[in-house]
């Protein structure tokens, strides 16, 4: 940190602004910087005032809504169930509907030419 400037942060009010000879401003956070002796601007030790103003109420509401939407998108209640939902399914992986209880053939239990791909489902 350089010794040229020292920052002082205080809670500003309209009365502080009027004491400095400036027009009254709404309450906010005021930062003042002063040049210390020995610096390049040693002769003039003035205070520079910077006023922080909060964003408009509607802008804050919109930002809070966007933040809550992002939180909801990132929050998954059961991540393992969601992850396995697209990968493993009994309907996709096992031929349940093709088996009829009355008909049993010797070739029925042999593997078919179909195979499962997680990118495209069942293929021949």
UniProtKB/Swiss-Prot annotation:
Disulfide bridge map: none
Location of the protein in the cell: Cytoplasm, Cytoskeleton, Cilium basal body
Bias (Polar residues): 102-115
Keywords: Cell projection, Cytoplasm, Cytoskeleton
Recorded superkingdom: Eukaryota
Record-level GO cellular component terms: ciliary basal body; ciliary base; cytoplasm
Keyword Cell cycle annotated: no
Protein's recorded name: Uncharacterized protein C11orf97 homolog
Source organism (scientific name): Rattus norvegicus
């Amino acid at each position: 940190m350089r010794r040229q400037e020292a920052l002082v942060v205080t809670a500003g009010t309209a009365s502080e602004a009027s004491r400095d000879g400036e027009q009254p401003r709404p309450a906010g956070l005021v930062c003042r910087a002063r040049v210390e002796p020995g610096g390049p601007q040693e002769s003039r030790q003035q205070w520079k005032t910077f006023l922080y103003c909060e964003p408009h109420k509607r802008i804050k509401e919109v930002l809070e809504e966007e933040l809550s939407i992002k939180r909801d998108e990132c929050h998954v209640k059961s991540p393992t169930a969601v992850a396995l939902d697209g990968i493993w399914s009994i309907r996709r992986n096992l031929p349940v509907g093709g088996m009829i209880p009355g008909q049993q053939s010797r070739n029925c239990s042999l593997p078919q030419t179909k195979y499962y791909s997680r990118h495209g489902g069942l293929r021949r």
